[in-house]
Design a protein with these regions (language model features):
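Conserved class I S-adenosyl-L-methionine
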Residues: 2-46, 150
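Class I SAM-dependent methyltransferase SAM/SAH-binding core
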Residues: 51-53, 57-100
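Conserved beta-strand signature within the Rossmann-like core of class I S-adenosyl-L-methionine
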Residues: 140-146
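Short, glycine-/aromatic-enriched active-site segment of Class I SAM-dependent methyltransferases
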Residues: 148-166
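A short glycine-rich, Lys/Arg-flanked "PGG" loop and its adjoining helix->strand segment in the class I
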Residues: 126-138
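Core SAM-dependent methyltransferase catalytic element
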Residues: 195-221
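A short acidic, Gly/Pro-enriched loop at the edge of an enzyme's catalytic core
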Residues: 99-111
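Short alpha-helix
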Residues: 167-182
């Protein structure tokens, strides 16, 4: 099966910038209280294993681990996974795709897509959300973070490197509608203005949704 171009693009770009990105992003959580607040809320609400999907260098996985979450990470980029394993040796990281997660149905209490769906074309989002739904147990939680907007931007420079990477900004109402169609119920929605114009140009959104069904009950298909 031929890999979609957007996956190849994202892997190649993040393999290229993995070390530079990790250095620049390492302390961002300390500078964005809303990030910490939402991650703290998610950590308090979730029970059972959590996978950080599109984990990058593992900074969010590491933070959740410190909050007591049973977390592991998966990323498309082998270089990012290598950085994550080095920086967070107490967390398990694997190479994988959010379109085809190596997990049984209903395996997770929670899933995290922290600025990772932003590299997936809008028309592919229903397939991604269906895969998130598949791997979550009934009542399981999904946390998403993304830039708010209705446009796609192509980056040819990033973190001091020549790259090619598309970033899709998302409309929270549209995302919630797609998540509802995939079998999720809304839980928490938060939007904020850019924290620092150096790295944020648009408002940012966080969504927590819950997979329909009672915890411990068989999934409804």
């Amino acid at each position: 099966v031929t890999e979609p171009d957007f996956l190849t693009m994202a892997r190649t770009a993040y393999d290229t910038v993995a070390h530079s990105y990790a250095d620049l992003a390492r302390d961002l959580l300390a500078e964005i209280p809303a990030d910490r607040a939402v991650l703290g809320l998610f950590a308090e609400l979730v029970s059972g294993p959590v996978v950080d999907i599109g984990c990058g260098p593992g900074r969010i996985s590491g933070y959740l681990k410190r909050l007591g979450v049973d977390v592991s990470g998966v990323d498309l980029s082998p270089e990012m996974v290598a950085v994550a394993r080095r920086e967070h040796p107490d967390v398990r990281f694997e190479v994988g795709s959010m379109l085809d997660l190596d997990l049984p149905d209903g395996a997770l209490g929670g899933a995290l897509a922290w600025y990772s769906v932003i590299h997936v074309p809008w028309e592919e989002h229903p397939a991604v959300f269906a895969e998130f739904h598949r791997v979550l147990a009934p009542g399981g939680l999904l946390l998403m973070a993304f830039q708010v907007g209705d446009e796609v931007r192509r980056y040819e420079q990033g973190y001091g490197h020549d790259i090619l990477l598309d970033v899709y900004r998302l409309n929270p109402d549209r995302v919630l509608g797609q998540l509802a169609e995939a079998g999720f119920e809304p839980h928490t929605r938060l939007e904020r203005q850019p924290a620092d114009p150096k790295w944020e140009k648009t408002p940012q959104a966080y969504l927590i949704v819950r997979k329909s069904g009672e915890p411990g009950q068989p999934s409804q298909t």
